[in-house]
Structure formats: C-alpha cells, structure tokens
C-alpha cells in the first residue's frame, strides 16, 4: 500500500510547515489527486488517519479533490480529457496521445490554527 508512504511524505511537509510558520494544528487538508495517480482513496484516508497520529494534522479533515486526466492527441491536434490512460481520443478515435495531466498529487491547502 503506497498510500502509507504518501502520507508519511505529507506528514513531513506538515511538520516542516508547522516549524516554519508557527502553527500548532491542521484542522483541514485538501489534496488534489489526478485520475491516473494510482491512489486508492479509501486506503489514503485510512493511512492519513494512522500516519498523522501525534502530528499537527492528527484529527484533521481530509478532503480529496479529483483532477481529470488530459492528453494531447497528435491525430486531431486537440487536448482531450480521458477516463483511462489507455483510452483512445474521444474526439477522433486516434491512439497517438501524450498524457499531460492526471498523474499528480499535491496539497492544495491546509487550514491551520
């Protein structure tokens, strides 16, 4: 379950930011997760609760925001949204696509006190 290691990285960021900016608690965290990031949301939520114990983010509400997967189609020269990384172009049916977004995961923001 790589969601555990993802949350360990998030914890490191939270602890670093708490030291830098002097906050003691995170009450809410919003994560942006791309469609192709390979993150299982239920596993991430569970891992977040476990890994954040004893950190400023313990008990924080985790909100996950879905980001679409987009690719450039070389057959029709359009940027398209994909449901699956291996899907053909929804506009022309072409298969020559270069993924542009959808594999990212980032902290969008945190509410702190």
Swiss-Prot record:
Statement: the UniProt record of this protein carries the keyword Lipid biosynthesis: no
Binding site for Zn(2+): 73, 76, 89, 92
UniProt keywords, alphabetically: Metal-binding, Nickel, Zinc
The keyword Secreted is assigned to this record: no
A GO molecular-function descriptor: nickel cation binding
Pfam family, one: HypA
Binding site for Ni(2+): 2
GO biological process: protein maturation; protein modification process
UniProt record similarity statement: Belongs to the HypA/HybF family.
Stated role: Involved in the maturation of [NiFe] hydrogenases. Required for nickel insertion into the metal center of the hydrogenase.
Protein name, as recorded: Hydrogenase maturation factor HypA
Species of the source: Paracoccus denitrificans (strain Pd 1222)
Phylogenetic placement of the source organism: Bacteria, Pseudomonadati, Pseudomonadota, Alphaproteobacteria, Rhodobacterales
Gene name, Swiss-Prot/TrEMBL: hypA
């Amino acid at each position: 379950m790589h969601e555990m290691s993802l949350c360990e990285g998030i914890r490191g960021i939270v602890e670093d930011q708490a030291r830098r900016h002097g906050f003691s608690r995170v009450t809410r965290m919003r994560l942006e997760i791309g469609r192709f990031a390979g993150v299982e949301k239920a596993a991430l939520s569970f891992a977040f609760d476990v890994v954040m114990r004893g950190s400023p983010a313990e008990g924080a509400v985790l909100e996950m925001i879905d980001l679409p997967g987009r690719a450039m189609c070389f057959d029709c020269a359009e940027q398209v949204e994909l449901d699956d990384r291996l899907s053909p172009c929804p506009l022309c049916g072409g298969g020559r696509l270069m993924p542009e977004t959808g594999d990212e995961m980032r902290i969008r923001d945190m509410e702190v006190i």
